[in-house]
Protein backbone atom coordinates (compact mmCIF):
# COMPACT_ATOMS: atom_id res chain seq x y z
CA UNK A 1 0.00 0.00 0.00
CA UNK A 2 1.14 3.54 -0.65
CA UNK A 3 2.05 5.99 2.06
CA UNK A 4 0.03 9.11 2.80
CA UNK A 5 1.44 12.54 3.68
CA UNK A 6 3.54 12.71 6.83
CA UNK A 7 4.24 8.98 6.75
CA UNK A 8 7.97 8.42 6.81
CA UNK A 9 9.54 7.40 3.54
CA UNK A 10 13.07 6.31 2.74
CA UNK A 11 13.19 5.63 -0.97
CA UNK A 12 11.50 7.02 -4.03
CA UNK A 13 8.16 8.56 -4.89
CA UNK A 14 6.74 5.06 -5.47
CA UNK A 15 6.32 4.74 -1.71
CA UNK A 16 3.95 7.69 -1.53
CA UNK A 17 0.35 7.74 -2.74
CA UNK A 18 -0.44 9.31 -6.10
CA UNK A 19 -0.03 13.06 -5.92
CA UNK A 20 2.62 12.92 -3.22
CA UNK A 21 6.39 12.69 -3.29
CA UNK A 22 9.02 11.55 -0.82
CA UNK A 23 10.89 14.54 0.54
CA UNK A 24 14.43 13.29 1.03
CA UNK A 25 15.28 16.39 3.02
CA UNK A 26 12.50 15.89 5.55
CA UNK A 27 12.07 12.13 5.24
CA UNK A 28 8.32 12.01 4.73
CA UNK A 29 5.71 12.13 1.99
CA UNK A 30 4.57 15.57 0.94
CA UNK A 31 1.95 16.94 -1.44
CA UNK A 32 3.49 17.61 -4.83
CA UNK A 33 2.18 20.24 -7.22
CA UNK A 34 3.13 19.69 -10.85
UniProtKB/Swiss-Prot annotation:
For whether the record's keyword set contains Transmembrane, the answer is no
A GO cellular component entry from the record: extracellular region
Q: Which GO MF terms are attached to this record?
A: ion channel inhibitor activity; toxin activity
Alphabetically sorted, this entry's keywords are: Disulfide bond, Ion channel impairing toxin, Knottin, Secreted, Toxin
Cellular localization per UniProt: Secreted
* Tissue localization of expression: Expressed by the venom gland.
Task: Give the chief site where it resides.
Answer: secreted
One Pfam family assigned to this protein is Toxin_12
Secreted found in the keyword field = yes
Question: Mind telling me which InterPro entries this protein's record contains?
Answer: Huwentoxin-1 (IPR011696)
Q: Which domain of life is it from?
A: Eukaryota
Q: Which residues form each disulfide bond in the chain? A: 2-17, 9-22, 16-29
Q: What is known of its domains?
A: The presence of a 'disulfide through disulfide knot' structurally defines this protein as a knottin.
| Annotated function | Probable ion channel inhibitor.
- Family under the similarity heading: Belongs to the neurotoxin 10 (Hwtx-1) family. 50 (Jztz-F7) subfamily.
Listed name of the protein = Jingzhaotoxin F7-10.36
Query: What organism does the UniProt record list as the source?
Result: Chilobrachys guangxiensis (Chinese earth tiger tarantula)
